[in-house]
Amino acid sequence: MLGAALRRCAVAAATRAGPRGLLHSTRTPGPAAAIQSVRCYSHGSQETDEEFDARWVTYFNKPDIDAWELRKGINTLVTYDMVPEPKIIDAALRACRRLNDFASTVRILEAVKDKAGPHKEIYPYVIQELRPTLNELGISTPEELGLDKL
């Protein structure tokens, strides 16, 4: 999104420039130029952790979620620079179960392990928190399936 905002600013600046380019502009920037630069960098208020978690839990708890939306949500969630909270993963696993998509459950758990990176205590904590859900839904972890040895 930042790249698009910067491109919009560059295009706006180029359209305001004179015939000889930006350095030799015939017009002096007025108050609108200051407003334009502020708009290019404002993205609204920051989302709190609780709002972020609630947004994703709500997304995965949609009763009419389909397989494409599930995969899109998982892919988007994996791109963030963080390990999702267990309650988000719980909602995603339940959505997988509603859709009978076992492959996605394994993929989610593998992604969580990968996102934990060198912090070896995170993945066991997440599995510990998810153990009741995993047992309830009949989901095996990648380690239980022997996928960690491949």
UniProtKB/Swiss-Prot annotation:
Keywords: Acetylation, Heme, Iron, Membrane, Metal-binding, Mitochondrion, Mitochondrion inner membrane, Phosphoprotein, Transit peptide, Ubl conjugation. GO terms for molecular function: metal ion binding. GO terms for cellular component: mitochondrial inner membrane; respiratory chain complex IV. Its main location: mitochondrion. A motif (SIFI-degron) lies at residues 2-17. GO terms for biological process: mitochondrial electron transport, cytochrome c to oxygen. SUPFAM superfamilies: Cytochrome c oxidase subunit E. Residues 1-41 form a transit peptide. Belongs to the cytochrome c oxidase subunit 5A family. Component of the cytochrome c oxidase, the last enzyme in the mitochondrial electron transport chain which drives oxidative phosphorylation. The respiratory chain contains 3 multisubunit complexes succinate dehydrogenase (complex II, CII), ubiquinol-cytochrome c oxidoreductase (cytochrome b-c1 complex, complex III, CIII) and cytochrome c oxidase (complex IV, CIV), that cooperate to transfer electrons derived from NADH and succinate to molecular oxygen, creating an electrochemical gradient over the inner membrane that drives transmembrane transport and the ATP synthase. This is Cytochrome c oxidase subunit 5A, mitochondrial. It comes from Pongo pygmaeus (Bornean orangutan).
